[in-house]
């Protein structure tokens, strides 16, 4: 479904940040207490919390169509998703967003923050352009590429900012 993610697939047990299994027949037996409904650029994420500290998410696209159910334990190390969209595009959307959510929460204890930004690299530094979708982040990035020598595109959607021993790094993750 997401060929660009295939290098990260692993059957090995070990020191993994998280495990996300996909089972389209999965449904939770009980819905947790609603934490909130969050508008994410026109998409909606319903978030619920169970008494044991685990989380449930309903990931909907911009048309409010349900694409994915996601359940995660309290530290997001063990997660299950059901891709319920009818179209391949909806299933990809659901899986991509489930992976981003799980990564963001599972990596947070390691001083990381998944951002919605476009990043230019120049002279060994990363410059993040932040803003809502459609506000010109990628346009600004293209202007740097065209007019500022030595610039290259590091990531055009979801970079990760990480602090290691007081130094801030920007990292590029894969994107569909």
Positions of PLM-derived features:
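Hydrophobic positions on the alpha1 helix immediately C-terminal to the Walker A/P-loop
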Residues: 140
């Amino acid at each position: 479904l997401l060929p660009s993610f295939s290098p990260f697939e692993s059957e090995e047990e070990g020191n993994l940040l998280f495990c996300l299994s996909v089972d389209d027949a999965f449904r939770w037996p009980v819905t947790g207490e609603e934490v909130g409904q969050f508008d994410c650029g026109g998409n909606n994420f319903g978030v619920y919390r169970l008494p044991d500290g685990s989380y449930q998410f309903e990931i909907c696209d911009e048309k409010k169509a349900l694409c994915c159910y996601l359940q995660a334990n309290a530290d997001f190390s063990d997660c299950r998703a059901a891709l319920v969209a009818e179209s391949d595009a909806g299933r990809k959307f659901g899986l991509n967003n489930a992976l981003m959510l799980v990564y963001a929460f599972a990596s947070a204890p390691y001083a990381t923050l998944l951002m919605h930004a476009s990043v230019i690299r120049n002279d060994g530094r990363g410059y993040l352009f932040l803003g809502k979708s459609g506000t010109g982040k990628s346009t600004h990035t293209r202007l740097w590429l065209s007019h500022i020598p030595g610039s290259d595109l590091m990531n055009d959607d979801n970079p990760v900012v990480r602090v290691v021993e007081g130094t801030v790094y920007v990292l590029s993750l894969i994107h569909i």
